[in-house]
Every structure is written in structure tokens, then in C-alpha cells.
UniProtKB/Swiss-Prot annotation:
It comes from Rhodopirellula baltica (strain DSM 10527 / NCIMB 13988 / SH1). Catalyzes the rearrangement of 1-deoxy-D-xylulose 5-phosphate (DXP) to produce the thiazole phosphate moiety of thiamine. Sulfur is provided by the thiocarboxylate moiety of the carrier protein ThiS. In vitro, sulfur can be provided by H(2)S. Pathway: Cofactor biosynthesis; thiamine diphosphate biosynthesis. The keyword Cytoplasm applies. This is Thiazole synthase.
Length: 287
């Protein structure tokens, strides 16, 4: 098989189809120019933007839309900073109106975040489920940030989430994938009756190997921000993340070999020049 034959199906979320499985945030960069260049290096097609009262903006007060090519990227408004379902619904509707004005196709979806704790930035499961149900009823394709709790993930899918996005670890922590077992359970449960249902790992990624691990577990994509924005060289890290998501995806599709306690020779044993005792014989010789 040639490398040209290693094709992959696109990632479908609601009405959107993406060939890149890396979704990238736009906050916390030193400069807007750095953000712009990092997005380009990442190869992403979808960028998340925080919604505020009057505009989509970054902490410097600059309008982020001046540095994002809305013809190139699908914008994904997010409700970052909301602590109640009501606030999240308001933010989502504001984002929808802004993107409709821009004519960007991202006006029909939203990344839902409803936080429950300002220190850990972990989500409030009750408010998240309530907001997801309301937004789905209002016609949004809802991508839900949640914890690694399989029960909450199931409830979000049941109330209409277009994608469930469990955290690898707390937002911005860089701690990586702390509970792979729970993520595997979430993947099993949510894909049981629909293997194409999108599960995207969101939050906690620290470096490229974390992205590969997430993809090797079977995730459909990874959403990240701080791991690029706070890297020593953000543009270089963005490029690393681009390669990592592809490497992890191909590894998942290819299938890893089983883990074994003992070694297994990769070279044929027939006709070897010398033999070496195994097991108890080796122990006797050693004594």
C-alpha cells in the first residue's frame, strides 16, 4: 500500500465536515500576529473564539476578527467564562448573531462551556446538560465541554449534543490525559450505536505526545489552545500538534500490537547459529 492510499474519512460534526481533526483556540497568545501564524501552522480548519457582550475579542482588547481569515476558517463561538446555563445560552445566541453578520458558516454551532469551579475550571454537569438541551432545541449544533464522567457524557448525547468533548485534564493545566480508562469508556458508550458519533478531547493537553495518546485511544479529534499559545515557540508547537493528531489517528486506524509480558523475537528463529536457553534452563545456567 502506498502512502497515497492512506486516506481517511472526514470529521463530521452537525452540518460541518472537517478534514483536519485538530481544533484550535485563539486566546492567550502574546500577540495577534503570533496567533495568526500559529493557526496557519496547525493546519486547522476550525478555530474557537470566546463570545463577549459586544464582539469576539482577546484579552488585549483587540478585535480578534481582524486577524482571522473568516473565509478560510470556520469559527466556533464558545461560551467560556459562563457559570450558569442561562448565561451560556445568551452567549451562544450572541455568537450566532455575530457570525451571521459576518456570513461565516459557524453561526449554527457552539462550543458549550458551563463552569462549576473557578479554580479547577471543571464543568458544572447539571448546568451543562440544561444548557445543551436548550441550545439543541434552539437549532444549535452543540459541542459540549464536559468532564471525563461517562454518565454525564451519555446524558449530553441524549439531550442532543452534536459532539461530546471530555477533558483530558483541567483547562490550561498541561497535565495531559490523566484518566484514559474513563475516556475509553466514554468512547465505547457514545459510539455503541453510532461509530461515527464525534468525541473530541478538549482541555489539558500539554504537548504533542498528549495529542497522539488522545487520538490513539480512539478520539475523533482534539481541541487545544494553551499548549500552543504558551509554548516557548508557539508556531513550532502548532506544527508539532498538526503532525501528532495525524500520527495518532493513523495509529488508531492501524491498530497497535497487543502488550505482552515477555519479549517476542521479530527475526525468524529457524537456522540461527547459536541457541540460548529460555526460562528455567537459563536460571540453572546462571546459578
Amino acid at each position: 500500500m502506498s502512502t497515497d492510499a492512506l486516506s481517511d474519512s472526514p470529521l463530521k460534526i452537525g452540518s460541518h465536515t472537517l478534514t483536519s481533526r485538530l481544533l484550535v483556540g485563539t486566546g492567550r497568545y502574546d500577540t495577534m500576529e503570533q496567533m495568526r501564524d500559529s493557526l496557519d501552522a496547525s493546519g486547522t480548519e476550525c478555530v474557537t473564539v470566546a463570545v463577549r457582550r459586544e464582539r469576539l475579542y482577546e484579552r488585549t482588547g483587540q478585535n480578534i476578527l481582524d486577524f482571522i481569515d473568516s473565509d478560510r476558517y470556520i469559527l466556533l463561538p464558545n461560551t467560556a467564562g459562563c457559570y450558569t446555563a442561562a448565561d451560556a445560552v445568551r452567549a451562544a445566541n450572541l455568537g450566532r448573531e455575530i457570525l451571521r453578520t459576518l456570513g461565516n458558516p459557524g453561526s449554527d454551532w457552539v462550543k458549550l462551556e458551563v463552569l462549576g469551579d473557578s479554580k479547577t475550571l471543571l464543568p458544572d454537569p447539571v448546568e451543562t446538560v440544561a444548557a445543551c438541551e436548550q441550545l439543541a432545541a434552539d437549532g444549535f449544533s452543540v459541542l459540549c465541554y464536559t468532564s471525563d464522567c461517562p454518565v454525564t457524557a451519555q446524558r449530553l448525547k441524549k439531550v442532543g449534543a452534536a459532539a461530546v468533548m471530555p477533558a483530558g485534564s483541567p483547562i490550561g493545566s498541561g497535565a495531559g490525559i490523566l484518566n484514559p480508562a474513563n475516556l475509553q469508556i466514554i468512547l465505547e458508550y457514545l459510539k455503541e450505536d453510532d461509530e461515527d458519533y464525534p468525541v473530541i478531547i478538549d482541555a489539558g493537553v500539554g504537548t504533542a505526545s498528549d495529542v497522539s495518546v488522545a487520538m490513539e485511544l480512539g478520539a475523533d479529534g482534539v481541541l487545544l489552545n494553551t499548549a500552543i499559545a504558551h509554548a516557548r515557540e508557539p508556531v513550532r508547537m502548532a506544527h508539532a500538534m498538526r503532525m501528532a493528531v495525524d500520527a495518532g489517528r493513523h495509529a488508531a486506524l492501524a491498530g497497535r500490537i497487543p502488550k505482552r509480558l515477555y519479549g517476542t523475537a521479530s527475526s525468524p528463529q529457524e537456522g540461527v547459529i547459536s541457541t540460548r536457553p529460555y526460562g528455567s534452563q537459563a536460571d540453572e545456567i546462571g546459578s
